[in-house]
């Protein structure tokens, strides 16, 4: 594993014209944030040694280097999901590579179903904590020397970055929610009974990604900020049939607000 991480990092280091310290993982319908990136240099996943290739509609599969505002960044346009058949080691491989390249901060975004009755479709939810409901843990097996055997997860999402996001949202007049995200393996959307269970467990939103990458980022000592776009509701009386296309549409409509918050945050760190 370490040899593959180092091989991939060496390959990317040769292609990089700058030394960014901020990375962004873009989820379903949120890939259009890349239009905000200037001085772009793109590498297709299929051309990167040891990188998996995303198979999901709406995830184009590129690594993008450039500037967001005045900061050098790297963006993953398309992520890898456990439900695609990848192991957790493969799902989180890019985060290990980020650590090897010296990244300090990771911004993650996703589309999620809301279980909180106060939420509406299109809301942005700042993730303040998560529940890991995946059947396999990304740190299972021999510990990689990037972090401790038993990592602390008491601040999986940086409180400093959360406070900064709330400040920016207030300045810009953008409505945001806060809550707990629960990560499940998918690929089915949740049944009404599952939504109810997740709410009882303490989740405000549910999705099929993010948690594995955040766990590994914490293991590597990378600070994390996460935001979910609420694309459907699992609240009694508000549950409707949902499709991937509808999820993408809702995420696309929320994208300008998320872009504003992300851009401002990255410029201020």
Feature locations, PLM:
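Metabolite-binding pocket within alpha/beta catalytic cores that recognizes anionic/polar moieties
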Residues: 1-153
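Non-catalytic positions within long, well-ordered alpha-helices that form the structural scaffold/packing
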Residues: 99-100, 199, 218
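Polyanion-binding loop/helix "lid" in catalytic or ligand-binding cores
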Residues: 146-157, 183, 195, 250-259, ...
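Short acidic/polar active-site loop segments enriched in Thr and Asp
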Residues: 104-105, 204, 223
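Generic non-transmembrane alpha-helical segments
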Residues: 11, 15, 160, 164-174, ...
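His/Asp/Glu-rich mid-to-C-terminal helical/loop segments that flank catalytic regions of hydrolases
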Residues: 235-269
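Active-site/ligand-binding-proximal alpha/beta "capping" segment
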Residues: 162, 168-204, 262
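Zn-dependent metallopeptidase/amidohydrolase metal-coordination segment
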Residues: 208-246
């Amino acid at each position: 594993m370490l040899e593959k991480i180092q091989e991939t990092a060496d390959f990317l280091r040769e292609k990089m014209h700058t030394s960014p310290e901020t990375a962004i993982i873009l989820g379903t319908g949120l890939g259009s944030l890349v239009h905000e990136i200037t001085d772009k240099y793109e590498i297709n996943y299929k051309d990167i040694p040891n990188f998996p290739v995303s198979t999901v509609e709406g995830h184009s599969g590129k690594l993008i280097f450039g500037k967001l505002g005045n900061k050098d960044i790297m963006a993953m346009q398309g992520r890898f999901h456990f439900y695609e058949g990848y192991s957790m080691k493969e799902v989180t491989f890019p985060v290990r590579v980020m650590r090897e390249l010296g990244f300090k901060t990771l911004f993650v975004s996703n589309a999620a179903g809301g279980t909180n009755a106060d939420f509406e479709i299109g809301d942005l939810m700042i993730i303040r904590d998560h529940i890991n409901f995946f059947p396999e843990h990304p740190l299972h097996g021999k510990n990689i020397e990037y972090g401790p055997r038993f990592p602390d997860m008491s601040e999986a999402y940086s409180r400093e970055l959360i406070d900064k996001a709330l400040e920016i949202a207030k300045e810009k007049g953008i409505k945001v929610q806060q809550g707990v995200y629960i990560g499940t393996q998918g690929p089915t959307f949740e049944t009404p009974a599952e939504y109810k269970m997740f709410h009882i467990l303490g989740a405000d939103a549910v999705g099929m990604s993010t948690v594995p990458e955040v766990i590994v980022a914490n293991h590597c000592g990378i600070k994390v900020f996460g935001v979910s776009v609420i694309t459907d509701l699992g609240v009694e009386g508000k549950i409707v049939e949902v499709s991937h296309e509808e999820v993408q549409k809702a995420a696309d409509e929320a994208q300008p607000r998320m872009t504003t918050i992300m851009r401002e945050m990255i410029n201020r760190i």
